[in-house]
């Protein structure tokens, strides 16, 4: 029996929204009108707003709604915040609101940014030694940086830009593999497009200069640029937060005496430090709240998730992101994570609810 190969659709992206829905209805739903009705019901009645949503992604045929919630009473560094949250998971907003209310009368949360360096890499193969590559980069550093002037001009005005270029020898891991590691300060933006644009410009300039570099020509050395891209691993973009209270203030919780509750809570945190089964679930709970505010503020929650989970493996094993300590009758919960976020750029300037979220946080 001859096997019938599935037919590939060509030019799907060029179809109108109506044509895409016709295709979906015909191929998957046997020409049912129900699918069109569902998709139409989730369109925005305001055509201008719908056009904004359509512009975010490709092949859009409708909107997928999630609840937009508020969690008040977050006292952070002695300022009272109302936190906008976007999540479909029940109990997340309730848990956050209860935690905020509990800690409000106990000094709230203390938080600080410890560092804010973001990093991108030019990945390349080079058939010479590190010193030859290092000399080439040092001799041409000014020209390499100058290639980004048009891109970095506005960022420099906001206090950001490129802060360092380092050569990393990775040949022990992969033959001829070197990295140029470039540090960035992206001010108040997440900076993904900015970083990638800078890396692309620098790569082109390096490729151009390397082909004219006398020593490389005479020695038979050549640089082959494999890719240029930012890294979502941001161990130098760190935020720390904590909350603490007297153990005696841990009252009316689960019907347990305050000292016993503190000990059980600390032990639960300690388990998440040593057992990966618990650590993954523990950290998922942390990300429930972080993801919700990232989505509400138009940030790339997938990038932040990737960076945070890699940070959880910093000690060569996956463990809890937060910890609990008991000292001098004080109960303290703390967390330190990489958090690369922005308040400008991306959909921040486009999505009306993202703008609203930032206004709520800034009030």
Regions found by a protein language model. Give the residues of each.
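Acidic/polar, glycine-rich intrinsically disordered N-terminal extensions of enzymes
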Residues: 2-81, 85, 89, 109, ...
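Hydrophobic alpha-helical scaffolding
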Residues: 43-47, 60, 85-86, 127-130, ...
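Conserved phosphate/anionic-ligand binding catalytic regions in large, soluble enzymes, centered on
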Residues: 67-95, 186-195, 273-298
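Generic beta-strand/beta-sheet core signal
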Residues: 77, 86, 183-185, 228-230, ...
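Mobile "lid/hinge" segments at catalytic clefts and subdomain interfaces of large enzymes
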Residues: 85, 92-112, 361-363
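Signature of multi-pass transmembrane helix bundles
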Residues: 104-114, 121-249, 254, 258-261
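A structural-propensity feature for long, helix-poor, extended segments
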Residues: 106-142, 312-363
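Glycine-rich anion/phosphate-binding loop at the beta-strand->alpha-helix junction
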Residues: 197-207, 214-349
């Amino acid at each position: 029996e001859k096997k019938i190969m599935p037919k590939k659709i060509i030019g799907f992206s060029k179809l109108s929204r109506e044509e895409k829905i016709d295709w979906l209805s015909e191929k998957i739903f046997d020409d049912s009108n129900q699918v069109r009705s569902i998709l139409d019901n989730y369109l925005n009645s305001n055509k201008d707003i719908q056009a904004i949503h359509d512009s975010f992604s490709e092949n859009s045929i409708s909107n997928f709604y999630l609840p937009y919630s508020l969690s008040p009473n977050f006292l952070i560094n002695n300022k009272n915040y109302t936190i906008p949250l976007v999540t479909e998971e029940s109990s997340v907003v309730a848990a956050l609101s209860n935690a905020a209310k509990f800690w409000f009368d106990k000094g709230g949360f203390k938080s600080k940014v410890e560092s804010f360096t973001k990093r991108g890499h030019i990945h390349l193969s080079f058939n010479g030694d590190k010193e030859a590559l290092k000399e080439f980069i040092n001799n041409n550093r000014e020209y390499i940086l100058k290639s980004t002037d048009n891109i970095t001009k506005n960022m420099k005005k906001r206090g950001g830009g490129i802060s360092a270029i380092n050569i990393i020898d990775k040949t022990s891991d992969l033959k001829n593999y070197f990295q140029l590691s470039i540090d960035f300060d992206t001010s108040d933006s997440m900076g993904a497009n900015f970083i990638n644009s800078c890396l692309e410009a620098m790569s082109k300039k390096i490729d151009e200069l390397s082909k004219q570099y006398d020593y490389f020509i005479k020695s038979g050395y050549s640089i082959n640029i494999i890719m240029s891209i930012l890294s979502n691993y941001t161990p130098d973009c760190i935020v720390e937060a904590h909350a603490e209270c007297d153990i005696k203030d841990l009252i009316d919780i689960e019907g347990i005496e305050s000292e016993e509750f503190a000990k059980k809570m600390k032990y639960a945190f300690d388990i998440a430090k040593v057992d990966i089964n618990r650590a993954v679930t523990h950290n998922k709970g942390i990300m429930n709240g972080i993801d919700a505010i990232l989505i509400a503020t138009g940030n790339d929650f997938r990038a932040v998730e990737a960076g945070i989970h890699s940070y959880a493996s910093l000690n060569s094993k996956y463990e809890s992101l937060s910890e609990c300590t008991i000292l001098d009758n004080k109960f303290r919960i703390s967390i330190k994570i990489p958090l690369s976020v922005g308040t400008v750029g991306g959909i921040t300037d486009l999505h009306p609810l993202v703008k609203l979220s930032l206004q709520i946080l800034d009030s």
